[in-house]
């Protein structure tokens, strides 16, 4: 078999006799133009861009960005590693550009953190022919040109002077152009803050650097203990120990819960429980973040959302406090990890179960967490179980973009479904059907959890809250993970519900009318820590009764 095609990987395009600046300029042009197509598209769609002066300003911004990219290339691409680094920049830029264009996301430190924690199943859900074509056109073509290109030979000191000269000249020209367009550019960046997260590859380089700095700082700090003074209600030998199940939803947005007013019947089980008088739905709840990486640790933290920045030193979680108070704690994981929250308590990952009914191709539907639950609880300390048990179930929920995978065939209510991960290619109704089926399955799952709790003799209760919401194409945005200050309400408005058994109602001495009055009040993930402590009757200096949703209603 002939291997002549390998010649394409050998040097073949001569730049001999031409100025070496042209080499880096070609790469800079590819990065600033092809690699920033979503940025230019977003700029062109702005209402301010509606006259000749505005279009001239866009040309000035493009020229300034290209020059800035040229400076950047000459700073990082040196002869010793020129070829691989150039291709790496193309891969990084075009991959980010694809996801920005396809899902309307932006690249910031939390988005990079999410990407770094993506498991193999999530990667498979993101692969598509469109991504392959993007990489072939955006990386393969310019990458081959770059790999085969050989700059003219020059002495070592000439290489330094050529590249440093390019940095100086490019910086001067960039500064001059920025002065010309500064007024327009500053106004655009101020009024449309997402733009600053859309400039490739600077957004990715900044995000990776910021994330590395944060993680390094956290590694150097020991885990901070909290709640060492925690204690629970004294054990009554005559009373059965309570069981609390905390279900942490995934990517469920309040806008698609019919119990909250959505027009499609996505939550019939919850509504039936509500009609029976045992379930309370809190309709005005805000998430702590717009992605799991932020929201789950924040949800179980004693710190509020504003304090849970990437500069916060790591602390123990709500589960540690419950354990210190003497409760038995079990975490069941059907997602991509507990983000450190469950590291010091008993936990089971469903990926090892391989249940024949509930698990397919390495992923499991949420009902798998109920299979063998009693047996798993029995493995916990009997002494702790005599005081009370908390079980946390971390759902697969509505994790996208493959929403159609989140509900088993027999639970699909709305058809036809979008079965593509290239969400913009689906019609709105099919996409909505796939997502609503995932919500309907969550409703079914929560109904099954309540059914299991009803079989228990002791006081039982269920708390449910989603980690964050989801965008389904509103304003061209899909999925989640937008910076919090600019995130649409679909990503931050989440469902929360409480189901209480008759025995737990007596145990808490709960005031039904009082609890119903809490349903329409504004709450957030900040209330979760204190509400769960209150539900477990745990006393600690960390507990703030005014933050406990149910405190005024328990006597």
Task: List each model region and its residues.
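Catalytic domains that recognize anionic headgroups
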Residues: 3-9, 21-23, 35-134, 140-555
